[in-house]
Structures are given as C-alpha cells and as structure tokens.
Amino acid sequence: ARGPETLSSLHMVFQNPFDTLNPSQSVGSQIVRALEKFGIGSTDADRENRMLELLDLVKLPRDFAKRMPRQLSGGQKQRIGIARAFAGNPAVVVADEPVSALDVSVQAAVSQLLMDIQNEHQTTLLFISHDLSIVRYLSDRVVVMYLGHVVEQGSTEQVFSPPYHPYTEALLSA
C-alpha cells in the first residue's frame, strides 16, 4: 500500500495544465486537498498557511487561492500544478513536457521557476521533453531515448557535443 510518505516523495507535473485542475473547485482548495493527501499539516489552518506559502513559492498572488481554474491563464494553471507537485516536499518531481502546451513567452518563465524551486528544495527533477534547448538549459545529465531505447546519455556537455546519434541530431535541428 502507498502511504502518505510514499505518495509525497514522488510527484508529477503534467503536460497539459488545462486537464489537471478540477473546474468546480478553487485552486486553493485543490492545493489544500493535495496537502491532506500527503498528510501535511495537523489542522486546517496549518494546511491553509502551507497552501499560501506554495502560492508564494510559484510566484502567484495569495488571492489566487479563491480563483477558479477558468479564471487563470495556461501559465498560471501550470504554476498551480507545480505548487501541488511540491506540496508534499517530494524527493523527485517528474515533469512530463511541462512547458510544451504553453506560449513561448511563458515557457521560459515556467522553466526558470522549476529550476529555482528544484535548486531551493534540493529536489531531483526528471524533465521529459522533445525540446532540447530547454533540456540543455535545465539539465545536469541528459538521456536521449528513441523508440524506447537509450541512444545517448551523459552530462549535458557530453550529449550536446558531436558526434550525435541521428535522433539527437533530428531533435537538435527541430
């Protein structure tokens, strides 16, 4: 069985922020629900305070807690997804194409936010993406997979230095 400790040690930021939030609940209540699931906070007031701290963490105003998902932009929704992912103080966060559904202007800000939070919390970030320019910016180590097989792996410097596997080259030129 997966207890709160197991659930909170690994979390995920999904690709599409539009599909990850319940449209009938405020974003604050959704973060509080994640905190309850992870066993964080002994009282409602503790969880409410932690939820506000998480909004601070993802650089959203605290009054966003009362907003409904339909009132948020894609980048703001993704920030709420990031807040929920970090609610349980995870050891590992899997980010599956977390910026691909966002406008290019928002991608850099969300990528930087992920990197800042990862550094601040000393969390391992497994960043899945086809966009190697973002991977190069965010990663210490890179694994390139093609058809389910690892075709290249190493430090960011090693993987981004020629010679490239043909698939890596295709991703770089895309």
Show where each model-derived region lies:
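Conserved ABC ATPase "signature" region
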Residues: A45-D63, L172
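A short, surface-exposed alpha-helical micro-motif characterized by mixed small hydrophobic
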Residues: V135-Y137
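Q-loop/switch helix immediately C-terminal to the Walker
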Residues: N16, Q25-K37
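ABC ATPase NBD coupling module
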Residues: A1-H11, S29, K37, Q158-P163
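Conserved ABC ATPase signature
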Residues: M68-L72, Q76
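Conserved catalytic motifs of ABC-family nucleotide-binding domains
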Residues: N89
